[in-house]
Amino acid sequence: MEINIDQTKNPEQNSPNSSHWYDNLWAAFIFFTRLPFWRLHQPPKSSYSAVVEWWPLTGWLTGGAMAATLYFGSMVMPYPIVVIAAIVVRLLMTGALHEDGLADFLDGFGGGGTDRQRILAIMKDSHIGTYGVLGLILYELLLLAALFSMSPEMAALTI
């Protein structure tokens, strides 16, 4: 069942070109998460260029889910499993968007030398390279070690 939050008595207000105060917020949630916000509302394409002001709120949403997994999960499961589950929750919620950007960055600057055009071409390439793989492995190991070294409460607050 799809719910449309745009249902108004005036059909002209539901046109694709109309703008609501929440369009940029919705665009940020749709772009930065894999949660099905698009089922509730389809913001105009122009809203996607103005999502910067909503980055903190989307971060609170994804970070809050990870923090809740750490805090509440530690009450019912062994902590090492909870740490892995919290990381998986974030990866699933964001579609690994940040990890993809990190891998592109590391591949570009690791393999591109000093040639700006080569760096940009490598960063645009959809294939992952050695620097991207190594960087992601080290990043995830560092995240695991950091979260595992903290109490569940401190880890949840740190996220």
Question: Positions of the model-derived regions?
Answer:
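Hydrophobic alpha-helical transmembrane segments
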Residues: 1-95, 111-120, 125-159
